[in-house]
């Protein structure tokens, strides 16, 4: 607001004029040439600007949840995956009676376009669904050899929310169903760039290796000094069952011919142990029958007694005189000491009288 000046005799307020600045005052002060040391100090003390200057374009959101009946190890694995994936969301456990296609509605309500669903059966078998909701495709795996972060206690470590590198085995590019799984894993597990909850650093790597017709997952820390890898965890193995065209259902695109269900595996192991038990019982029965059989007597071999020498016969001596009894020295000493004590007692009693 401009400055005003009031007249002395009650007149109206008049706007005061600002004093004019000279041309010399208008000029900025002359800058002193900074030395190299001052420039270095300014650079050192300067606060760097924000690292993330880009725009968040990849809006991938992953829903990670499970069915009822999971054990503690599955729950810890689910928490580890949520920690490693800042673009994930959680939800309550789904009831076993609900059909799997209901998960597409849950994803739509949570505004998620990808889903990792853990399905527990018989409180000992764990299945994992990877799905692109709502149009598919989706893949079903049997999860084996689970080791969580708290269980492993590895020396590796990474920043929470940092973006990972994804390393795939060359075998993923050889077969079409592995190529489809590779693209699905890339879209689900890779953290979007410039995500609000992510950190602009790359300090760990997810490795996917194919061995024995299974996918082995490992998480390693990248050390800055020599680019060495130190395992962080968790670790698990995915045994592929089927790939479906739709999300949680639809036509089957691929079925693993090498897959053996856990029920069949337990049945085979039980049959092997039963066969071993039956074999042991048969051996015992044969041994009992052999013991009951009469022993076959071999004919006497006359040549067996060729080198047998008869022992010398000692003459039999008959003792006619009764042997003298042995003297018991201890009993004899006791009797002597007993006599001496009695003699002393008599002498002492005579003196007192």
Curated annotation (Swiss-Prot):
Residues 22-36 have a biased composition (Basic and acidic residues). Gene3D superfamilies: Probable brix-domain ribosomal biogenesis protein (3.40.50.10480). Its main location: nucleus. The modification Phosphoserine is found at residue 261. GO terms for molecular function: rRNA binding. Residues 1-10 have a biased composition (Basic residues). Residues 60-249 form the Brix domain. SMART domains: Brix. InterPro entries: Brix, BRX1. One of its GO terms (biological process) is ribosomal large subunit assembly. It comes from the Eukaryota. One of its GO terms (cellular component) is nucleolus. The modification N6-acetyllysine is found at residue 276. There is a cross-link at residues 160, 314, 322 (Glycyl lysine isopeptide (Lys-Gly) (interchain with G-Cter in SUMO2)). Residues 1-46 are annotated as: Disordered. Keywords: Acetylation, Isopeptide bond, Nucleus, Phosphoprotein, Ribosome biogenesis, Ubl conjugation. The keyword DNA repair does not apply. It is found in: Nucleus, Nucleolus. Required for biogenesis of the 60S ribosomal subunit. Belongs to the BRX1 family. PANTHER family: RIBOSOME BIOGENESIS PROTEIN BRIX (PTHR13634), RIBOSOME BIOGENESIS PROTEIN BRX1 HOMOLOG (PTHR13634:SF0). This is Ribosome biogenesis protein BRX1 homolog. The gene is BRIX1.
């Amino acid at each position: 607001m401009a400055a005003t000046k009031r007249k002395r005799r009650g007149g109206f307020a008049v706007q005061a004029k600002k004093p004019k600045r000279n041309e010399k005052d208008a000029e900025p002060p002359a800058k002193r040439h900074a030395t190299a040391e001052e420039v270095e100090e300014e650079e050192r003390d300067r606060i760097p600007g924000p690292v993330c200057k880009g725009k968040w374009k990849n809006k991938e959101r992953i829903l990670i949840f499970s069915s009822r009946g999971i054990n503690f190890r599955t729950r810890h694995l689910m928490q580890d995956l949520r920690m490693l994936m800042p673009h994930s969301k959680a939800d309550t456990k789904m009831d076993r009676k609900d059909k799997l296609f209901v998960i597409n509605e849950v994803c739509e309500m949570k505004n998620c376009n990808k889903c990792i669903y853990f399905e527990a059966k018989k409180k000992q078998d764990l299945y994992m669904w990877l799905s692109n909701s709502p149009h598919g495709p989706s893949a079903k795996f049997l999860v084996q050899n689970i080791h969580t972060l708290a269980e492993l206690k590895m020396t590796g470590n990474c920043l929470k929310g940092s973006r990972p590198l994804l390393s795939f085995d060359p075998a993923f590019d050889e077969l079409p169903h592995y190529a489809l799984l590779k693209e699905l894993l890339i879209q689900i597990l890779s953290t979007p760039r410039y995500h609000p909850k992510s950190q602009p650093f790359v300090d760990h790597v997810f490795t996917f290796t194919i061995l024995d017709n299974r996918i082995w997952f490992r998480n390693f820390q990248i050390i800055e000094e020599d680019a060495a890898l130190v395992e962080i965890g968790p670790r698990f193995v995915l045994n592929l069952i089927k790939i479906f065209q739709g999300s949680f259902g639809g036509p089957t695109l691929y079925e693993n011919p090498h897959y053996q269900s856990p029920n069949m595996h337990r049945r085979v192991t039980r049959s092997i142990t039963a066969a071993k038990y039956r074999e042991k019982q048969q051996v015992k029965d044969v041994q009992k029958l052999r013991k009951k059989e009469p022993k076959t007597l071999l004919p006497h071999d006359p040549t067996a007694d060729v080198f047998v020498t008869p022992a010398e016969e000692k003459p039999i001596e008959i003792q006619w005189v009764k042997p003298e009894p042995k003297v018991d020295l201890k009993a004899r000493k006791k009797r002597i000491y007993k006599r001496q004590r009695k003699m002393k007692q008599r002498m002492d009693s005579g003196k007192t009288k």
